[in-house]
Amino acid sequence: MISPEQSRAARGWLDWSQDELAKRANVSLSTVRDFEKGRRTPIANNLEAIERALTAGGIEMLVEQDRAVGIRLSRT
């Protein structure tokens, strides 16, 4: 599952604001803001929507042993 750090890094790479990500993921701005600041973890559906939006933007989430470790541009 995506981490707050991955979300921030991916947004930066895509040059998206938190508002842009929220719109693309169809979640509230406060959901993105609170998640990225580590205030709370969104419900599973919202967390998946955030990850899908970033993936659709061309970002691949890197995970090792069930731990989020980074991002990279998608190869496809």
What kind of feature is each model-predicted range?
Residues E5-E20, S74-R75:
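Short basic helix-loop element that most often maps to the first helix and adjoining turn
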Residues I59-T76:
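Helix-turn-helix/homeodomain-like alpha-helical modules used for DNA recognition
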Residues N26, N46-L62:
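DNA major-groove recognition helix of helix-turn-helix/homeodomain DNA-binding modules
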Residues G12, K23, T55:
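Short polybasic/polar patches that bind polyanions
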Residues L14, I43-N46:
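Short, conserved glycine- and acidic-residue-centered signature motifs
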